[in-house]
Amino acid sequence: MSNLPFTVAALYCFAPLPQYESLREPLAQLCCANGIKGTLLLAAEGINGTVAGSAGAIEKLIAHITAIPGLGEPELKYSHASEMPFHRMKVRLKREIVTMGVEGIDPLKSVGTYIAPKDWNALIADENTVVVDTRNDYEYAIGTFEGAIDPQTRTFREFPEWVKQNRDRLEGKKIAMFCTGGIRCEKATAFVKGLGFDDVYHLKGGILKYLEEVPREQSMWNGECFVFDERVAVGHGLAESDVELCRACRRPLTPQDKLSQFFEEGVSCAGCYAERTPEDRARYAERQKQVKLAEKRGANKHIGS
């Protein structure tokens, strides 16, 4: 049991939800009434999201979601935060609950073999296994598993094309995939199996479940795991990390990254300095000035974030 005041729940479930639009308002009302913040995505293929609130509030929400007809038990990962990691509550209607952009991908029909965290090390240590990080390049940059391939994608939509262009690296191998919480791998493994590969595996519960269950001394994870909230990243035991966001480009920054000559809080980092014009940086600098003034007044921290 954590002493931190906020419970963070990352959840998803693939299930046919033909009337998903009607679920939006009841979910939004329940979350607002119980002080829950975060994002929930609803689509005809299921539900996905990460939310935070008191333990009791999150328990109510999960009970509500589990009771939705046809949905069943969602895949759930819990962690904790010292401060509310979200600024508002959003319940959105989408075409996909995780956007791959490939028609006909259905994890309910075909998906890779799930590997429990306790068995993951043995799989990725096998010399006949190719380990693929299905996340984006900025996530890979701050942490990944030993020997994992970085597809260097900026969005998950780019992943299918990477697979097609790198078939030769996967042929004749066991293909082990992983992502933050497991949902991207549901579609990634379904896509790869659809191309004719048979030995396709993915980490059940994702990196978050691995970091929760596998002791640091046995871990093959290096670095931090990026999360899409104000904690920015978590480490072993799902402890909060010292990684921060560049408020200009939203890239994660380690303490070492902040030593770069191109880093200026709220204005630029080494990753985005060359991508921005002097006018952009001047605008960001003014915004950062307003953020600091607002903080002094005790206003909301998320101005400009």
Curated annotation (Swiss-Prot):
<dbReference type="Pfam" id="PF00581">
    <property type="entry name" value="Rhodanese"/>
</dbReference>
<keyword id="KW-0819">tRNA processing</keyword>
<feature type="domain" description="Rhodanese">
    <location>
        <begin position="125"/>
        <end position="219"/>
    </location>
</feature>
<dbReference type="GO" id="GO:0006400">
    <property type="term" value="P:tRNA modification"/>
</dbReference>
<dbReference type="InterPro" id="IPR040503">
    <property type="entry name" value="TRHO_N"/>
</dbReference>
<dbReference type="GO" id="GO:0016705">
    <property type="term" value="F:oxidoreductase activity, acting on paired donors, with incorporation or reduction of molecular oxygen"/>
</dbReference>
<dbReference type="InterPro" id="IPR001763">
    <property type="entry name" value="Rhodanese-like_dom"/>
</dbReference>
<dbReference type="Pfam" id="PF17773">
    <property type="entry name" value="UPF0176_N"/>
</dbReference>
<dbReference type="InterPro" id="IPR036873">
    <property type="entry name" value="Rhodanese-like_dom_sf"/>
</dbReference>
<keyword id="KW-0560">Oxidoreductase</keyword>
<comment type="function">
    <text>Catalyzes oxygen-dependent 5-hydroxyuridine (ho5U) modification at position 34 in tRNAs.</text>
</comment>
<protein>
    <recommendedName>
        <fullName>tRNA uridine(34) hydroxylase</fullName>
        <ecNumber>1.14.-.-</ecNumber>
    </recommendedName>
</protein>
<comment type="similarity">
    <text>Belongs to the TrhO family.</text>
</comment>
<feature type="active site" description="Cysteine persulfide intermediate">
    <location>
        <position position="179"/>
    </location>
</feature>
<dbReference type="InterPro" id="IPR020936">
    <property type="entry name" value="TrhO"/>
</dbReference>
